[in-house]
């Protein structure tokens, strides 16, 4: 009789654990379809179309921008930068204002909305190599980086990760 009571008690404990785990699973599944924000809140307003953003880079030295784009690369060390595709095989390198926030490292292929100051800049060989290491490139690939490059850049105040 005592063994039966012990087994019954153990089954009740297991059922409680299963119910808790099931509840956590349901909560996490419901949250996965929501947007996630990083940094400052992005204000309502118009988003610059990707087809127009390149013209702004050509026409202005610096400008405030809010755009929606697909993430093509993310720092695999801590999520401290990302690249966004804007069409015509062009990317924007996004850093985060004062390194005050980071993004998840597993968002390549996801869409984001970013808001911040956009500008063109020359990036040194050392910095290009640093970013290659952050991406996890091997030294044979890194050794091929021998020239600085002009890039489109954006210092983001805020990021919204879309579902």
Language-model-detected regions and their locations in the chain:
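Bacterial Sec-dependent N-terminal signal peptides
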Residues: 1-37
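OB-fold and OB-like single-stranded nucleic-acid-recognition modules
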Residues: 34-163
């Amino acid at each position: 009789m005592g063994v039966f009571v012990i087994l019954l008690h153990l089954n009740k404990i297991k059922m409680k654990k299963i119910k808790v785990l099931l509840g956590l699973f349901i909560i996490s599944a419901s949250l996965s379809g929501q947007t996630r924000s990083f940094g400052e809140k992005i204000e309502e307003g118009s988003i610059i179309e990707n087809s127009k953003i390149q013209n702004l880079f050509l026409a202005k030295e610096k400008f405030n921008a809010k755009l929606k784009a697909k993430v093509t690369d993310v720092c695999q060390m801590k999520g401290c930068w990302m690249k966004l595709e804007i069409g015509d095989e062009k990317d924007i390198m996004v850093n985060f204002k004062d390194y005050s926030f980071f993004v998840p490292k597993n968002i390549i292929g996801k869409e984001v909305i970013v808001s911040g100051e956009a500008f063109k800049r020359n990036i040194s060989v050392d910095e290009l190599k640093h970013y290659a290491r952050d991406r996890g490139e091997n030294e044979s690939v890194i050794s091929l980086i021998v020239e600085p490059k002009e890039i489109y850049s954006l210092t983001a105040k805020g990021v919204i990760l879309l579902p």
